UniProtKB/Swiss-Prot annotation:
Classification via InterPro entries: Aldolase_TIM, TAL/FSA, Transaldolase_1, Transaldolase_AS
Descriptive protein name: Transaldolase
Keyword entries, A-Z: Cytoplasm, Pentose shunt, Schiff base, Transferase
GO cellular component, as recorded: cytosol
Gene3D superfamilies: Aldolase class I (3.20.20.70)
EC number(s) given by UniProt: 2.2.1.2
Residues at the catalytic site: K132
Record CDD domains: Transaldolase_TalAB
Subunit record text: Homodimer.
GO biological process, one term: carbohydrate metabolic process
Entry-linked HAMAP family: Transaldolase_1
Family, per entry: Belongs to the transaldolase family. Type 1 subfamily.
Signal peptide, first to last residue: none
Amino acid sequence: MSNQLQALRDITTVVADTGDIEAIKKYQPVDATTNPSLLLKAAEMEQYRSHLENAVAWAKEQSDDADQQIIDAGDKLAVTIGTDIVNIVPGRISTEVDARLSFDTQASIEKAHKLIALYKEAGIDKSRILIKLASTWEGIKAAEHLEKEGINCNLTLLFSFAQAQACAEAGAYLISPFVGRILDWYKAKTGKTEYAASEDPGVQSVTKIYNYYKEHGYKTVVMGASFRNIGEITELAGCDRLTISPGLLEELSNSDAPLEVKLKDTGATTTPGKPLDEAAFRWEMNQDAMATEKLSEGIRNFAADQVKLETLLKSYV
C-alpha cells in the first residue's frame, strides 16, 4: 500500500522547501525552493562551512569594497547551494532575489541577471533556474521583463487574488501562494484556533486562484507553499505543484490515509477580462488587510534573514 507522499506524487509535482541537501536526497522531490531564511538555516550547518569560506574568497577576488564583497558572497553562496541542489533534483531550483530590492524593478532585473550568470559559470543552464521575486507590483513587472528574456520566475509572498491575477497577466512562469501564513493571520485576528482543512482560508485562497487560472487558460503554474499541517496539503491535492518542508514530507510518508484529488483542470471556459493596471492593483491590495500585512511582514523577515546571513559571512572575511 502506498503512503500519502507517494499518492500525492501521482497527481501533483512535489517540491522540497529546503536548502538541506540530505533532506532533498531523502525525499527525492522534482524541484526545490530556497529563500533567505532557508539559506541562513543551511549556512549555520557545519557541513556548509566550506561553502561560506569559498563564497567569501571568491567575493574578495571580485571587489576591493568590503560592502560589495559581502553582497557578492551572499549571491555566490545562494548559487553554490542551489547548484548542489540542482545536481540532485531532476527539475529546477528556485533562488530568491534580495528582498530589499522588492520595490525596485530595475535592481531586481539586474540581480536576476547576476544570479543567472553565476549559475552559468557553475555550468547550470537558465532552464534549470527559477528566479524568485516578491509579488509586489515592482517584482511582478521585473518578472514580466525577465520572462520576455527567457528567464523564468517564481513569484513568491503571494497572499491575494489581485497578486495572482497580475502575475498571470504578466506571463509569470510560476506563483507561490502562501497557505499557512494566511491561516496564521486569520487565527491571530479571529481567535479561532482550529480550522477544518476545507475551511482553511489559505486553502480556499489557493483553490480560488487555481480555478481562476485554469478557467481562463493561464499557463502560469500554481505552486502552493507555506504549509502548517498535512491537512492543508491533502486538501490541495491535484494542484500543479506543492512545495513542502521536510517535516511535513516525513508526515506524509508516514501516513497511509487515502488521498482524494481535490483540484482538477477542466479546461479553459472563460476569456480573460481587462488586465489590472498599477492603480487597480494597489487599490485591491489596500483593501485586503491580510495580504498587505503578510506581504510587508514577509519582505521584512526575508530582508532581516539576509542581513543575518551577511553578518555570518562577515565573520569569514
